[in-house]
């Protein structure tokens, strides 16, 4: 489905609209199954509450101005805006966690403190649709034109598209100082230049946020850990889909507790950034 699908814009728009209609209903149904109740506040939901008696030893990250970067994964319209193609399944989680607002707070705090700030975006070019095999979510993303761009050197139709940066952050990202890496293509940064950009600036500690929690954020976390970075994940500056297959945010949160060097709220992250 993703390899030779019709690239006609009208067909693609129809697919995007169909997904928004269909997945909105799936999101509501899945939320009821997974969470067991209606619109509970995310961070106070029993589903997301930290264990009262954790078995794993505590760890933390001590950040500094010269060795720490804020890395935001996929702060893009397709993930974070009601206009985006994924809103039908991620919108509830984004709203619960105040993800858009919290990512903005991190951007502003990091800029004010003089930290390195990097964005790792997800883009697909026409040549990427020639892949011969893909996983389930890759197939879906290709079929509905998620993160599609006209080409690596072609910005036609980019402004305001699903692949564009959220308008709330666009001025901060395009300030001439933010690192905008080459795009990652599946989930993690092994296919882009994030590691190079951070190492060249002496960064060995990362504050990680963005979308989607159980996909690209989690993949970035694992890759950065394997490369020797200390990583603090900001738990309410991310979100994930709720579908019949499961609650992506809950799945990610469990793994964040297992492997991240630290797991902070936005309030805590901002406080620490302001103190460097």
Regions found by a protein language model. Give the residues of each.
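A short alpha/beta connector and helix-capping loop motif
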Residues: 84-110, 115-116
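Short acidic, Gly/Ser-rich segments with clustered Asp/Glu that frequently serve as metal-coordination loops
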Residues: 76-82
